[in-house]
Design a protein with these regions (language model features):
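A compositionally biased, intrinsically disordered/low-complexity signal enriched
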Residues: 2, 61, 107-108
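Hydrophobic beta-strand-centered segment that forms part of the acyl-chain substrate-binding groove
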Residues: 123, 130-182, 186, 196-200
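A conserved, well-ordered hydrophobic junction motif at loop->secondary-structure transitions
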Residues: 94-134, 140-147
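Extended repeat-based solenoid scaffolds, especially LRR ectodomains
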Residues: 41-98
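Generic structural detector for well-ordered beta-strands
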Residues: 105-107, 154, 204-206
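HotDog/MaoC-like acyl-thioester-processing domains
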Residues: 1-56, 161, 172-260
Length: 260
């Protein structure tokens, strides 16, 4: 979390006191938090909006580009975005990224304001989370989505009372039984219809054939995991989102493995 002043600048907070019954445990948790902050800064510095993809990611983008061109040449049923069998490409099923999009447009009311008179960030997070869940349910169809992690939450611009907000959720990456959903929040200018991004949130889910859950200490929280459709991007912006999703899932697996 961060503390902000009403001008949107960093606000000074109290220094954390690490005295207590178990000081070593407290210091260990503090150091873990410090390392997470440092890792977050490093990830931000290597964002795809600030630096070029790695050589491996460039190869992935090119491979996906060639596959998407081949898919475009298939019959109309494939172009419609429905799950289809593509044996020649080695994909049992796929979905175009653009066909996983779901949206929600809301008017921001004063009861959701914070102490600075803007919309409370927790309300925006709640709205985005609900949309990600709907997106996940529609993506897995007859199966059950299992929430695993909120990977990254970005606040780019404050949201004022009375603002018209558009929330857009989509599946940006999938691998085996896991998939990544990205929710973008935009402020819509009612006079110009221009959209300004205010929030970006990333969620990781798993698909299950039943609503049963495993242990919270396991990497997989569901006991009857099922594979989901491969996500195929078309436009360059979708390729960037795909790589972001792949990074998010890799980070999740690494963090869970180190904690087990």
């Amino acid at each position: 979390m961060v503390a902000r002043s009403k001008e949107g600048k960093a606000a000074k907070i109290h220094t954390l006191c690490m005295d207590g019954e178990h000081p070593e445990d407290i210091k260990l948790r503090f150091e873990s938090g410090r390392m997470r902050v440092q890792q977050r800064k490093e990830k931000s510095a290597h964002s795809l909006y600030r630096s070029v993809p790695s050589p491996d990611e460039v190869d992935t983008i090119h491979r996906l580009f060639l596959e998407s061109k081949s898919l475009k040449a298939q019959k109309d049923a494939i172009l419609s975005g429905r799950v289809e069998s593509i044996d020649a490409l080695g994909r049992s099923k796929f979905k175009w990224m653009k066909n996983t999009i779901y949206k929600n447009v809301l008017l921001m009311h004063p009861q959701e304001r914070n102490i600075h008179g803007n919309i409370f960030g927790g309300y925006l997070m709640k709205t985005a989370m609900e949309l990600s869940w709907v997106t996940a349910m529609c993506f897995v169809g007859k199966h059950f989505p299992v929430f695993l992690s909120a990977d990254k939450i970005e606040f780019m611009n404050p949201v004022s009372i009375g603002a018209i907000m558009e929330f857009t959720g989509r599946v940006v990456y999938s691998y085996s039984d896991k998939f990544v959903i990205q929710v973008l929040a935009y402020h819509i200018d009612r006079e110009t219809n221009e959209k300004t991004a205010t929030n970006k949130l990333t969620y990781i889910y798993q698909a299950s054939s039943s609503p049963e859950f495993g242990s919270a200490n396991d990497l997989d929280l569901c006991v009857n995991a099922v594979e989901v459709a491969d996500i195929v991007p078309k436009e360059y912006e979708e390729f960037v989102a795909y790589i972001e999703g792949r990074r998010a899932l890799a980070d999740y697996k690494q963090s869970r493995s180190s904690n087990v």
